[in-house]
């Protein structure tokens, strides 16, 4: 490392205290004269491909150095006992080469960080443990999902749990389709003997409605179509996922919103005082709980078909007697389920997802006009009372209930096949 310093006037250095800075590097440095001029060997520097320690040194005139204090601007006191100029030329060259060589050796050497043996052993053990835990967790979750999807209930201690983030969307749509299809078929069968409040109004019956009933009657009637769409729910969900793809939480939120609408609309209907306590608990029960409760009852009574038929007849009779006195306002059936799904996905995607499509795209995919979708979107918000926030625990609870329903349905189908 060598330094080139020149004053503005080389002939009269003492008259001008200003000095310039010039830094150059070379393997051989010569500090013999006041004005040092050593050029850098760029080819050698590029071939070695190494970095030099750059030391900035101020070269000034003798008068400027004498006028400075004993302490420099960097805070380093010069050694008064050693005079570099007094040394011989050979000694100066040897000292410069020794310092330069030691600096370059320090730079070129690579010293890896060494941990103590205990730390290395602990680090390796921790990495191995993390790999084992991650591998075990992945295998167990995939195995558990496959077992539940296949209807395997041999391990009763394992509680069915659905991983919302990693669960395949196509499998989730199959489960969601199975649940909604069961609810719709059940409501369609009881529509003739147990019509809902909206169906009675459509049939021309004039009923005395309260203010709360009138508040939700118009939004509920907006989703009811005159004709049943020919497309099934499985194809409808696949069409939505193909042209307007979204995440699992959006599809699961449909169950949450449908249950909220059902509880809110059916709780405001006129109920006789004698039957208020009797209908209080079922109105607060979700459709998933009812489906799972019915599935558990059917699986438990599968060995005795006669008792099952008698219980179902008694239950249907009781439901008919109670429902005549307490008609429900919001009932999901084949006439309104498609509009509820496309409106719910439109609202849920805009609220839960960072990416969503325009209403014109949703309307074309859903098979309705843009004006109708805009109207249904507003009516859906009114039915939800503009409460769209869903907590993580609530969404996970509905996902687990859906998982449990799918598990029970698979077990029932396998039991029926075995019994035949």
UniProtKB/Swiss-Prot annotation:
GO cellular component: cyclin-dependent protein kinase holoenzyme complex; cytoplasm; nucleus
Compositionally skewed regions (Polar residues) per UniProt: 134-143
Modified residues (Phosphothreonine): 317
Transmembrane spans: none
Region (Disordered), start-end ranges: 1-82, 134-155, 268-321
Single annotated GO MF: protein kinase binding
Biased composition (Basic and acidic residues): 277-296
Keywords: Carbohydrate metabolism, Cyclin, Cytoplasm, Glycogen metabolism, Nucleus, Phosphoprotein
Keyword Phosphoprotein: yes
Composition bias type Low complexity, residue spans: 7-22
One Pfam match: Cyclin
Summary of the function given for this chain in its UniProt record: Cyclin partner of the cyclin-dependent kinase (CDK) PHO85. Together with cyclin PCL7, controls glycogen phosphorylase and glycogen synthase activities in response to nutrient availablility. The PCL6-PHO85 cyclin-CDK holoenzyme has GLC8 kinase activity and phosphorylates and inactivates the phosphatase PP1-2 inhibitor GLC8, causing activation of PP1-2, which then dephosphorylates and activates glycogen phosphorylase. PCL6-PHO85 also phosphorylates YJL084C.
Family: Belongs to the cyclin family. PHO80 subfamily.
Protein name per UniProt: PHO85 cyclin-6
Organism: Saccharomyces cerevisiae (strain ATCC 204508 / S288c)
Organismal lineage: Eukaryota, Fungi, Dikarya, Ascomycota, Saccharomycotina
């Amino acid at each position: 490392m060598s330094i080139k310093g020149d004053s503005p006037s080389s002939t009269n250095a003492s008259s001008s205290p200003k000095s310039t800075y010039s830094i150059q590097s070379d393997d051989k440095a010569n500090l013999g004269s006041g004005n040092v001029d050593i050029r850098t060997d760029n080819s050698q520097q590029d071939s070695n491909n190494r970095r030099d320690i750059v030391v900035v040194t101020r070269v000034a005139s003798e008068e400027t150095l004498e006028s400075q204090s004993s302490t420099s601007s960097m805070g380093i006191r010069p050694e008064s006992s050693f005079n570099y100029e007094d040394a011989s030329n050979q000694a100066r060259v040897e000292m410069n080469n020794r310092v330069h060589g030691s600096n370059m050796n320090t730079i070129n050497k690579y010293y890896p960080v060494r941990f103590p043996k205990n730390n290395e052993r602990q680090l390796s053990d921790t990495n191995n443990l993390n790999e084992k835990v991650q591998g075990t967790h992945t295998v167990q979750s995939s195995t558990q999902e496959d077992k539940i999807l296949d209807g395997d209930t041999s391990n009763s201690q394992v509680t069915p749990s659905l991983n919302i983030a990693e669960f395949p969307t196509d499998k989730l749509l199959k489960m969601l389709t199975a649940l909604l299809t069961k609810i719709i078929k059940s409501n369609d069968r009881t529509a003739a003997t147990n019509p809902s409040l909206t169906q009675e109004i459509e049939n021309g019956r004039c009923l005395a409605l309260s203010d709360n009933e009138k508040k939700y009657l118009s939004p509920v009637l907006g989703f009811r179509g005159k004709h049943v769409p020919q497309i099934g729910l499985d194809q409808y969900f696949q069409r939505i996922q193909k042209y307007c793809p979204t995440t699992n939480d959006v599809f699961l939120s449909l169950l949450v919103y449908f249950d909220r609408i059902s509880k809110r609309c059916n709780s405001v209907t006129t109920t006789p005082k004698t039957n208020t306590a009797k209908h209080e608990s079922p109105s607060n029960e979700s459709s998933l709980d009812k489906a799972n409760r019915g599935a558990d009852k059917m699986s438990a009574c599968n060995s005795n078909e006669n008792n099952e038929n008698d219980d179902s007849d008694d239950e249907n009779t009781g439901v008919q007697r109670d429902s005549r006195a307490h008609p429900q306002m919001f009932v999901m059936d084949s006439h309104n389920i498609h509009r509820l799904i496309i409106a719910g996905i439109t609202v849920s995607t805009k609220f839960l997802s960072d990416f969503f499509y325009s209403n014109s795209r949703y309307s074309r995919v859903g098979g309705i006009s843009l004006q109708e979708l805009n109207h249904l979107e507003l009516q859906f918000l009114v039915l939800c009372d503009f409460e769209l926030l869903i907590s993580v625990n609530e969404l996970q609870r509905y996902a687990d209930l859906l998982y449990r329903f799918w598990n029970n349905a698979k077990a029932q189908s396998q039991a029926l096949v075995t019994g035949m």
